[in-house]
């Protein structure tokens, strides 16, 4: 293992839940306002995961007041406090960009049934 890979291994978070595109997750991340820091939640559907190792990112989409909002988070960022899987979704694609064009009930994703 070379030097860069060993440094990346030290920075990678270990306690992350497993989630895939189609899952609804809640990301609690730290926001700095002035001189104080608070935790803000962002809940939505994962529409993509990309990269690997320390530079892996994921994009979460939600509808806020009728407007679609997408936010891309680095998976191992220190600003992310926690990630919680709300529900598992059943999709057959790795990139769910088609959700951008859908509105209302058509934008819903089937829930993955667990036995």
From Swiss-Prot:
Q: Which InterPro entries match?
A: Ribosomal_bL19 (IPR001857), Ribosomal_bL19_CS (IPR018257), Ribosomal_bL19_sf (IPR038657), Translation_prot_SH3-like_sf (IPR008991)
UniProt keyword annotation of Amino-acid biosynthesis present? no
The name this protein carries in UniProt is Large ribosomal subunit protein bL19
User: Organism, per UniProt?
Assistant: Desulforamulus reducens (strain ATCC BAA-1160 / DSM 100696 / MI-1)
* CC per GO annotation: cytosolic large ribosomal subunit
What this chain does, per the entry, is described as: This protein is located at the 30S-50S ribosomal subunit interface and may play a role in the structure and function of the aminoacyl-tRNA binding site.
Q: Which family does it belong to?
A: Belongs to the bacterial ribosomal protein bL19 family.
One Pfam family name is Ribosomal_L19
Claim: DNA damage is one of the keywords in the record: no
For this protein, what is any one GO molecular function term? structural constituent of ribosome
Q: Which UniProt keywords apply?
A: Ribonucleoprotein, Ribosomal protein
One GO BP annotation here? translation
